[in-house]
C-alpha cells in the first residue's frame, strides 16, 4: 500500500506541474477571444515581416493578474527595454518550461517555488509590444510547442475549438 500511495503522490505532483491552465484567469479574458494571436508564422506588428510566433498572446487590461500555469520554480526574471520586456520563465520539471512576457509588474523572484494559479505578475506592454497582453510560451525539452494544447481549463469543447480557430486565423502578433 505504501508503494501505491507513493506512486499516486508522484503522479499527482506531475499533473500539478504540467502546464494546464491559461496564464490569465478566464474571468479576465475577453470571452469571445477576438484578440488572441496564436502560435505560428505571424506578421510582426513592429518589424512588419512574417516571423515565427512561438506563443499565444492573451489580451486583457493592463494590471490584470498573470498566473503560473503549473507548479514549478522560477528560473529566469528579466527586465528588458525591448524584446520580451519584463518576463518570467518557470521550470515545471518533466521537461516543461513556460515563459510569460510583456509584464507591467513581476511579483516573483528567481529561485522561488510557485503553485499553479499563483499570481506571478501583471499584464503590461513592456518590451517590443503594441498593447497590453501576456505573451505565453510552453517549451517541452527545450523546444517551443503550441501552448493552445495546454489551455483547456474552464472551456467547453466548443469554446476550446473556437479559441483554437481564432488563434490560427490571426495573422499578426501583438509582440
Language-model region placement:
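Non-catalytic extracellular/periplasmic "stalk"
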Residues: 1-34
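Catalytic cores of peptidoglycan-degrading enzymes
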Residues: 27-174
Amino acid at each position: 500500500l505504501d508503494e501505491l500511495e507513493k506512486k499516486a503522490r508522484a503522479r499527482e505532483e506531475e499533473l500539478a506541474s504540467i502546464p494546464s491552465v491559461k496564464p490569465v484567469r478566464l474571468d479576465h479574458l475577453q470571452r469571445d477571444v477576438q484578440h488572441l494571436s496564436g502560435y505560428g508564422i505571424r506578421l510582426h506588428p513592429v518589424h512588419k515581416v512574417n516571423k515565427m510566433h512561438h506563443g499565444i498572446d492573451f489580451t486583457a487590461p493592463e494590471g490584470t493578474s498573470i498566473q503560473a500555469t503549473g507548479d514549478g520554480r522560477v528560473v529566469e526574471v528579466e527586465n528588458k527595454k525591448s524584446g520580451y520586456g519584463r518576463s518570467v520563465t518557470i521550470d515545471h520539471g518533466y521537461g516543461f518550461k513556460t515563459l510569460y512576457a510583456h509584464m507591467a509588474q513581476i511579483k516573483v523572484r528567481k529561485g522561488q517555488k510557485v503553485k499553479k494559479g499563483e499570481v506571478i505578475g501583471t499584464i503590461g506592454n513592456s518590451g517590443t509590444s503594441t498593447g497590453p497582453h501576456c505573451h505565453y510560451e510552453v517549451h517541452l525539452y527545450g523546444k517551443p510547442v503550441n501552448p493552445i494544447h495546454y489551455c483547456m481549463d474552464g472551456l467547453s469543447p466548443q469554446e476550446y475549438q473556437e479559441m483554437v480557430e481564432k488563434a490560427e486565423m490571426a495573422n499578426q502578433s501583438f509582440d
